[in-house]
Design a protein with these regions (language model features):
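Short, small-residue-biased leader/transition segments that mark boundaries at the very start
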Residues: 1-6
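Active-site beta-loop-alpha junctions enriched in small/polar residues
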Residues: 8-12, 33, 69-75, 93
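Histidine/lysine/aspartate-rich catalytic loop segments that bind and position anionic ligands
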Residues: 8-46
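Catalytic cores of alpha/beta
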Residues: 13-25, 70-88
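Generic structural signal for well-ordered alpha-helices
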Residues: 18, 47-54, 77, 103-107
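Conserved, mostly hydrophobic/aromatic
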Residues: 28, 53, 69, 80, ...
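Glycine-rich phosphate-binding active-site loops on the catalytic face of alpha/beta enzymes
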Residues: 29-40, 83-103
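Short helix-capping segments at alpha-helix termini
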Residues: 57-63, 111-113
C-alpha cells in the first residue's frame, strides 16, 4: 500500500509556516487562488511562494514535488514551470473552449521544459 503525504498552502499561508515540515512530505500544493470555486484569477504572488519553496527544497537536497492549483493557463504556465512547480492543475483553462486544442497548447509549453 503506497501513500503520499501532501501539504497544502493557501494563498495567505507564509512559507515559514510549512518550512519545518518540508522533509516530511512528498508534495507541497501551492494554491494560486483562494480555494472554493473554479475560474478565479491566478494570484501572481504564488510564483514567489513556489520559488521560495523550490529553493528551500533544493538547499535541503529534497526531491519533493511542488503542485500548483488555481488560475493556471497557457499564458502563465511557462512562469509557473520556471518558478519550480512540476505538477500542474488546470481545470478551467483546459475545459473552457476546445479541450483538445487546450491540452495541445499545454503540452507544447510543458515540452519546452
Amino acid at each position: 500500500e503506497f501513500r503520499r503525504v501532501l501539504f497544502r498552502s493557501n494563498p495567505p499561508t507564509p512559507v515559514s509556516a510549512i518550512e519545518p515540515y518540508l522533509d516530511k512530505v512528498d508534495m507541497v500544493l501551492v494554491m494560486s487562488v483562494n480555494p472554493g470555486f473554479g475560474g478565479q484569477k491566478f494570484i501572481p504572488e504564488s510564483l514567489d511562494k513556489v520559488k521560495e519553496i523550490r529553493s528551500l527544497l533544493d538547499a535541503k537536497g529534497l526531491d519533493t514535488d511542488i503542485e500548483i492549483d488555481g488560475g493556471v493557463n497557457a499564458g502563465n504556465l511557462a512562469s509557473v514551470l520556471e518558478a519550480g512547480a512540476n505538477v500542474i492543475v488546470a481545470g478551467s483553462a483546459i475545459f473552457s473552449g476546445d479541450v483538445a486544442d487546450n491540452v495541445k497548447k499545454f503540452k507544447e509549453i510543458m515540452g519546452a521544459w
